[in-house]
């Protein structure tokens, strides 16, 4: 499955140097800082929707003030993909959304557009592409992640013209 990982250029420099997206790293979203919205160590967090990866990269940019955003596109074998129980806990504390899906993974991917894997993503072992976006060169960057809080089906069927154009013109590069 093609999945995406969004981060800031400051963090991506280390990823490029190491040639790996690490499952154990310093987290932006910690229990101490974010309460229920924290990320568990030992996982690489991913999304099945490219503008959502950009949204997460932008949220991280607001913290570390990086000059650019980086989104990685990775081909992950289906058997490695796990539900993002952190996002499910945060977004669906009562479990109502989970009840509508036949599996936690489907709920995670199609309701919350997130998942995770419990291994590092080595550039030598996975097919990885990326693009870099200079934050200051995009007018109204928030327009690129319109409907970020909506489920996968809604987001992908309601892309704006700006989003469609952006997605079509992404200059993917192989790492």
What positions do the PLM features span?
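ADP-ribose/NAD+-binding catalytic cleft of ART/PARP-like enzymes
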Residues: 1-41, 58-59
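Short, surface-exposed beta-edge/turn micro-motifs
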Residues: 1-2, 40-43, 50, 67-69
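Hydrophobic beta-strand residues in large extracellular and virion-surface proteins
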Residues: 3, 15, 45-46, 70-74, ...
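Short, flexible loop/turn elements at secondary-structure junctions
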Residues: 5-11, 48-50, 75-78
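Eukaryotic short linear interaction motifs
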Residues: 12-13, 54, 81
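Low-complexity, flexible helical/coil segments
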Residues: 22, 35-45, 82, 108-116
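Short active-site loop/helix that positions an aromatic residue
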Residues: 50-64
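Active-site and NAD+-binding cores of ADP-ribose-processing enzymes
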Residues: 68-175
